[in-house]
């Protein structure tokens, strides 16, 4: 398996960010259920330029997160794990399985109800949290497993982006959408003309975000489009894409995602938690993340290898693929993000966030201990 120049930096920042995110989440949950809860909740909903602070984080700052995801995906396509179609097929099939099966389980529980729109919730993977859990196992983790999980999560996020664009766009203002796409086309022309200066791309990106925001399509899509408009060149440290990607790693990991977590995990816990957990949408989310994710990743990966479409890396086995599949069930920030688009009822949103947190925690614990067991046995077998 191939490793890109920025992969180690990406992995390090993501795992550190994941641990920081856990701290932010616990802090937010405690404060949201304390004596100062009202002030804390009011802070995130305070008016800022006509919208709440939470709104600007979700529709503004998260666009920068998706820009980084787009740049990572671009690098993987041109110069990384996804550049070789044979190598790319394993995480691609795993990601497809990890989206279809969770969505299917959710729909089994919710089809025909007002909450069926939440099928996209268990389809996403939180890269930062998943890599943070993986990093707790230290140097025991094969490099190919780190790359598999990272590629899987990036493809998952791409799937989530497509889902947001296709299924969570309620009303379209075609004029604004066409202007946004026109700006994207103009930036592609700049790319083809080999204009490497980052400034026109960033200015164009701001205007594209504005018109996308007012088109009905979720504005975060702008981040991914902008990423693929920015010149990749030969991908070395002087390329425009590399410079921006390198610059964004830490602000995204240690500012944007933690801020998103603080704003969106201010969950007021219900006094009747048992009633929350037996709702159809709650069961659907839990089944999707805890069972659907690992099962889908495992089955589709095995199918792809069985059909000769790709091969399993020499230092991996099916037990490790199943174990890492549970880490794919850590939906957290991405699942919460889709929840905000899928539902309008504040009670359902609050309950869904709680179930996402619990399900992600369970998936993470199962993934950690199953991987620890699998890797320990693999080391013993290799010694024998």
From Swiss-Prot:
Q: What is its main location?
A: membrane
What catalytic reaction does the record list?
Na(+)(in) + 2 H(+)(out) = Na(+)(out) + 2 H(+)(in)
Give the signal sequence positions: none
Q: Could you state one GO cellular component term attached to this entry?
A: plasma membrane
From its record, what is one biological process in GO terms? regulation of pH
Q: Name one GO molecular function term.
A: sodium:proton antiporter activity
- The record's disulfide annotation reads none
Stretches assigned to coiled coil: none
Q: Which domain of life is it from?
A: Bacteria
Q: Which Gene3D superfamilies match?
A: Na+/H+ antiporter like domain
The record's section on Pfam families has:
Na_H_antiport_1 (PF06965)
Where's it found, cell-wise?
Cell inner membrane
Its membrane topology is listed as: Multi-pass membrane protein
Q: Which InterPro entries match?
A: Na/H_antiporter_dom_sf, NhaA
TM ranges are: 17-37, 53-73, 89-109, 118-138, 147-167, 171-191, 198-218, 251-271, 283-303, 321-341, 354-374
What keywords were assigned to this record?
Antiport, Cell inner membrane, Cell membrane, Ion transport, Membrane, Sodium, Sodium transport, Transmembrane, Transmembrane helix, Transport
Function of this protein?
Answer: Na(+)/H(+) antiporter that extrudes sodium in exchange for external protons.
Can you tell me which family this protein belongs to? Belongs to the NhaA Na(+)/H(+) (TC 2.A.33) antiporter family.
Record protein name field = Na(+)/H(+) antiporter NhaA
């Amino acid at each position: 398996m191939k490793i890109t120049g920025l992969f180690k930096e990406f992995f390090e920042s993501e795992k550190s960010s994941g641990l920081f995110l856990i701290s932010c989440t616990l802090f937010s949950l405690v404060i949201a259920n304390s004596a100062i809860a009202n002030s804390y909740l009011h802070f995130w909903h305070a008016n800022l330029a006509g919208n709440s602070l939470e709104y600007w984080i979700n529709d503004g700052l998260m666009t920068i997160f998706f820009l980084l995801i787009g740049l990572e995906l671009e690098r993987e396509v041109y110069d990384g794990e996804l550049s070789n179609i044979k190598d790319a097929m394993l995480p691609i099939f795993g990601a497809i399985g990890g989206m279809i099966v969770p969505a299917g389980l959710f729909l089994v529980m919710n089809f025909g109800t007002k909450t069926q729109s939440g099928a996209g919730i268990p389809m996403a993977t939180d890269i930062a949290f998943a890599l943070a859990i993986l990093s707790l196992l230290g140097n025991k983790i094969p490099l190919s497993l780190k790359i598999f999980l990272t590629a899987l999560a990036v493809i998952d996020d791409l799937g989530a982006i497509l889902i947001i664009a296709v299924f969570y766009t309620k009303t379209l203002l075609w004029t604004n959408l066409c202007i946004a796409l026109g700006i994207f086309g103009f930036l592609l022309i700049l790319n083809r003309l080999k204009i490497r200066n980052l400034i026109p791309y960033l200015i164009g990106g701001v205007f594209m975000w504005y018109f996308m925001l007012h088109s009905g399509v979720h504005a975060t899509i702008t981040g991914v489009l902008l990423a693929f408009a920015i010149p990749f060149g030969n991908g070395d440290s002087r390329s425009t894409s590399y410079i921006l990607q390198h610059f964004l790693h830490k602000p995204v990991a240690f500012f944007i995602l933690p801020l998103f977590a603080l704003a969106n995990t201010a969950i007021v816990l219900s006094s009747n938690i048992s009633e929350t957990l037996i709702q159809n949408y709650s069961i659907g989310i839990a089944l999707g993340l805890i069972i659907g994710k690992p099962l889908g990743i495992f089955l589709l990966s095995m199918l792809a290898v069985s059909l000769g479409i790709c091969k399993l890396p020499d230092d991996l086995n099916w037990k490790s693929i199943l174990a890492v599949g549970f880490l794919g069930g850590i939906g957290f920030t991405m699942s919460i993000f889709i929840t905000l688009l899928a539902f309008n009822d504040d009670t359902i949103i609050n309950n869904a966030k709680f179930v996402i947190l619990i399900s992600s925690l369970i998936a993470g614990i199962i993934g950690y201990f199953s991987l620890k067991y699998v890797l320990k046995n693999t080391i013993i077998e290799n010694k024998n």
